[in-house]
Amino acid sequence: MIAHKKEFYGGGFMMLIFIVIMVIIFSPVFNGKNGLQYMDDLYNCISKGSAYVIPQLKEKANKFMGNNLNLTLVMKDNKQAEESVTLLKNAGAVVDISGSELKVAGDFGKILISALEDADLMYANEGLKVSSKYSYDERQVIYNWWSLFKAIDKDLKKQKKFEESKGISEISKKGLELSYNYYKVEPQKVSDRWGILAFSLIFYVAYTLWYGFSIMFMFEGWGMKLEH
């Protein structure tokens, strides 16, 4: 039984507005995307601009120039091993392949720089240059670099080369992974989109409070109240 009709129907009307707005948010009315997709893309564009650290990573990689390593790497399968040979040879390494296993001798610094140059092109959304360089898909190139670095890191730890392991791990996470994830995302500055960012934060708080008050008024209309 409704004890207070004014509060109950007022809360019900607020809930109806909440639901209507939610339907709009989940509808493809923002350039063919729903509201969540639109905001997710916006935040990705903004975060890409602030996450770019490849020049700093190149400086760290240069410190390993002249550091010659002999590595034994096991790749996922024969196909990935064959594709990875191209990457390593482009970096000046000597590679012997046997199935999915690679025996690599090369300058550690040159290998790191070669991977970072490809990552830099991907970060700038110039994947065509990467694919034409190796004659296969640019995303697969970066994935193969990432897989190579994972295998190299494993072998470096076996050899107790922990400084090199730390360096390649950082470059893999901050260089390769980000260039792969942000590929084809157009970077934007916070200063250029501060209006929509401020609106989204204010809207989120207001929308949440609106929902809370609608529930509260409906329960009060039913005669239910919180008491100390």
Predicted segment positions?
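Short, aromatic-rich amphipathic segments at membrane interfaces
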Residues: K157, K161, S169-A206
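Generic structural hydrophobic/aromatic packing signal, biased to beta-strands
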Residues: F13-M22, L71, V95, V104, ...
